[in-house]
Every structure is written in structure tokens, then in C-alpha cells.
Design a protein with these regions (language model features):
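Processing junctions and N-termini across compartments
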Residues: 4, 61-64, 156
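Short, surface-exposed, charged loop/turn segments at secondary-structure junctions
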Residues: 9-26, 73, 85
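Short, flexible loop segments at boundaries between secondary-structure elements
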Residues: 20-42, 50, 95, 99-100
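Mid-to-C-terminal catalytic subdomains of enzymes
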Residues: 36-91
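Secreted/luminal cysteine- and crosslink-motif detector
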Residues: 2, 68-71, 120
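Single conserved hydrophobic/aromatic residue that forms the stacking wall/gate
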Residues: 1-11
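Peripheral terminal appendages
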Residues: 52, 73-162
Length: 162
């Protein structure tokens, strides 16, 4: 296996997948991570070259694409979450009270985002619609016209929304 960034066995390009079952099911399952050595710019350039439409999260201003209410989100990401999903944000606040435990060790969610500028970019109405409705069709995978970097590109790797 090719190793990544001199990190030894931690980040291999190809590893055995956790569902690997050579002995019991007589099958070998690999996990291939072809872009593990790519920089963020490298990934965006591949998408640009192939006119791949970025995930709506990136187009709506988020810097990462994972759980919308990720506990590792920054105040700006949670402020964007609140703006896009107000009911779910209220449910998270309710859960903090019900559990007697806050996502941040020092304050509740509302205090955590106080004064934060939401990451949400409202200029891509199609992306906002996709995030609210969950609808993203096959016809939206590629871009016909000019490709451009999404609003969430190059904003670091903190947090983990959408």
C-alpha cells in the first residue's frame, strides 16, 4: 500500500475495509481512498475539470459536508444551521435543557453562536432548496455552464456540518 504523508499505517491509500471477512465468508473487501494525498485545492480542481456540481452544503457556504448539527461545528456553522433549520436548532436547544448538558462545555447553544456571522450563502437558491427538501437529482450532478468554486471552498476544516 502507498502511504500518505509519512504517517505510517495511519493513512494508507488502500486498507482492508471493516466488513472484510476472509475467513468466514471467503471474501476480501478493500477500502480505497484515492484522494487521501490531495490538498483541498487538488480536489476542487478535479471537480472543476470534470464539471462536477459540488454538494449543496459547499454551495450554501459550509466548509465541510457531514452531520448538520455536528457537535464540532463552529459558532458560524451553527448560526448557519439555525438560519437554515430553525426548528431543528430549537430542538437542539430543548435537548440541551432536557439533558442538562450543553454541546459546548462553557455555554448553551444560543450563547455559543451569539455575535457569529452565519456561514450561510443565500446566493445559490438551488443549493438552499436541496438542503431544505433533501432533493438532489441525477441531472444536477454535472454542470453544463461555467464551473465556479462554491461559497464554502477554502474556509478551513473546522467543524463538520451538513
Amino acid at each position: 500500500c502507498l502511504l500518505s504523508r509519512g504517517l505510517g499505517d495511519v493513512y494508507k491509500r488502500q486498507i482492508y475495509f471493516r466488513a472484510n471477512a476472509e475467513k468466514k465468508l471467503k471474501r476480501t473487501v478493500h477500502q480505497w481512498r484515492p484522494v487521501i494525498d490531495y490538498s483541498e485545492k487538488d480536489v476542487w480542481e478535479v471537480m472543476k475539470r470534470n464539471k462536477v456540481n459540488p454538494h449543496p452544503c459547499y454551495r450554501a457556504g459550509w466548509n465541510r459536508c457531514s452531520c448538520a448539527g455536528c457537535i464540532f461545528s463552529t459558532p458560524e456553522l451553527f448560526a448557519g444551521f439555525k438560519e437554515l433549520y430553525p426548528q431543528e436548532f430549537e430542538e437542539m436547544k430543548h435537548d440541551e435543557k432536557a439533558l442538562g448538558f450543553t454541546l459546548d462545555n462553557k455555554c448553551d447553544l444560543e450563547t455559543y453562536i451569539e455575535g457569529a456571522k452565519p456561514c450561510l450563502y443565500k446566493g445559490d437558491k438551488e443549493a438552499i432548496h436541496s438542503l431544505i427538501t433533501g432533493i438532489f437529482t441525477e441531472s444536477q450532478i454535472f454542470i453544463d455552464g461555467q464551473w465556479k468554486y462554491p461559497a464554502g471552498a477554502f474556509h478551513g476544516a473546522e467543524g463538520g456540518p451538513c
